[in-house]
Swiss-Prot record:
It is an enzyme of class 2 (transferase). ADP binds at T12, R16, T266, G309, G410, N414. It comes from Alkaliphilus metalliredigens (strain QYMF). GO terms for cellular component: cytosol. Homotetramer and homodimer (in equilibrium). This is Glycerol kinase.
Length: 500
């Protein structure tokens, strides 16, 4: 029997390949960062060829460094940065423009046009999403409108659109397969998550030819096999795909309605499983597809926070008050509190539950006694405050009061942040033994499709807690601090508009 599953984890800043064994333990990994392009203020792009180059490179590298043969790989699972939009030429396989990244705000104007056309309620009710530049739909329109000859080629059926999963599967199979999974499709703002099909009315409003779109498949099924030239002659099933946040929900074994996880990465993303029920949000959350597995499609509520770990990168790269992200834990604990300082990291607007494309970052409450450590501490605290904003909306929408929150992602190794998170939520925070849950979720989805794991019960039994953080902060103090945060956010909202 084959011994391993390979997860390809194509993130916003790096491409990773991780090998997991039958126990769900990591046996090897390889990672490579790639270039971020910022052609104008608020614009973010990647080079699709570099995405593919780094992703295929780390896949080969992890096999070399572990000495594991392609013959021992039972399947490949893919997880990816969602919403990021790639359009390529069907005949040459070459992109016609850079990938427009989920963080990119250039299509805010197209979103305003959709609202002016009265499409907002329709989109909300049928895709589960808000009209925002974050999602793929307006990015596709922008490329078709701005790349010379693109619209004509698209109408002639010569162009293909895909989120990153589609682009990787297309390249792994050398152009034989053009598919996506339910979870990724549900983030395009083009997919009707009630009827489970591409939405003609939205495609028409954005003037996007249906022939460009990938076929939507289950999150756990064999889509195709690696081409012989991709992996030195190997024929490995590509058997699972899910957007990064849905993959993390699966990797955390949140299989029952009401179970939730928060992933702390570049942004922060909290998802709650709502089972086979489309739960509309009245509180600025998204309703999204969690996954399609075992012939069933399940839904989730999601709160997307645009800037979390990215704020720590900003402290390091732009303000240069830390050398690396790990320093923040020590420096934050060198001061007793944030000295009344609040950081609102709205560098690319505010996500859930505010959805304000025109909010901008702010540091408030500064006095002459404010030190670098206070700003560092306030930056970490901002991640926890934003999480509370989302959790309150989620409890309101679902009618479920959360007893504990499962956490994952890079920043969960920061004990200060995790303890403050438990304190400000007033809820137990569970950090699992394996924090690579995004890649693990992709591995589980692929493994289920090829019989490497029996069923979801077997997977649920593998989930083990590493550390439990229990709330210790006194209630009056907690609420006072949170009120201060809400005041700070209100100052940052709609900032850009005030110029006009």
């Amino acid at each position: 029997m084959k011994k391993y599953i390979m997860a390809l984890d194509q993130g916003t800043t790096s491409s990773r390949a991780i090998l997991f064994d039958q126990e769900g333990k990591r046996v090897g990994s390889s990672q490579k960062e790639f270039t971020q392009f910022y052609p104008k203020a608020g614009w973010v792009e990647h080079d699709p060829m570099e995405i593919w180059g780094t992703q295929s490179g780390v896949a080969r590298e992890v096999l070399e460094t572990t000495g594991i043969s392609t013959q021992d790989i039972a399947a490949i699972g893919i997880t990816n940065q969602r919403e990021t939009t790639i359009i390529w030429d069907k005949n040459t396989g070459k992109p016609i423009y850079n990938a427009i990244v989920w963080q990119c705000r250039r299509t805010a104007g197209i979103c305003d046009e959709l609202k002016a056309q009265g499409m907002e309620t329709y989109i909300r009710e049928n895709t589960g999403l808000v009209v925002d530049a974050y999602f793929s739909g307006t990015k596709v329109k922008w490329i078709l409108d701005h790349v010379e000859g693109a619209r004509e080629k698209a109408e002639n059926g010569e162009l293909l659109f895909g989120t990153v999963d589609s682009w990787l599967i297309w390249n792994l199979t050398r152009g034989k397969v053009h598919v996506t999974d339910y979870s990724n499709a549900s983030r395009t703002m083009l997919y009707n998550i009630k009827e489970l099909k591409w939405d003609e009315k939205i495609l028409e409003a954005l003037d996007i030819p249906k022939s460009m779109l990938p076929e939507v498949k289950a999150s756990s099924e064999v889509y195709g096999h690696t081409d012989h030239q991709t992996f030195g002659g190997a024929d490995i099933p590509i058997a699972g795909a899910a957007g990064d946040q849905q993959a993390a929900l699966f990797g955390q074994a949140c299989f029952q309605p009401g179970m939730a996880k928060n992933t702390y990465g570049t942004g922060c993303f909290m998802l709650m499983n709502t089972g086979e029920k489309f739960v509309p949000s009245e509180n600025g959350l998204l309703t999204t597809l969690a996954w399609g597995v075992d012939g069933k499609v399940e839904y989730a509520l999601e709160g997307s926070i645009f800037v979390a770990g990215a704020a720590v990168q900003w402290l390091r790269d732009e303000l240069r008050i830390i050398r690396d992200a790990e320093d923040t834990e020590y420096l934050a604990t060198k001061v007793a509190d944030s000295n009344g300082v609040y950081v609102v990291p709205a560098f690319t607007g505010m996500g859930a539950p505010y959805w304000d494309m025109y909010a901008r970052g702010a540091i408030l409450g500064l006095t002459r006694g404010a030190k670098a450590e206070h700003i560092i501490r306030a930056t970490l605290e901002s991640i926890a405050y934003q999480t509370r904003d989302v959790l309150e909306a989620m409890q309101e929408d679902s009618g479920i009061e959360l007893r504990s929150l499962k956490v994952d992602g890079g920043a969960v190794s920061n004990n200060f942040l995790m303890q403050f998170q438990a304190d400000i939520l007033g809820v137990q925070v569970d950090r699992p033994e394996i924090i690579e849950t995004t890649a693990l979720g992709a591995a589980y989805l692929a493994g289920l499709a090829v019989g490497f794991w029996r069923d979801k019960n077997e997977i649920a039994n593998k989930w083990k807690v590493d550390t439990v953080f229990s709330p210790t902060m006194e209630n009056t103090k907690k609420e006072k601090m949170y009120r201060g945060w809400k005041r700070a956010v209100n100052r940052a909202l709609k900032w850009e508009l005030e110029e006009e």
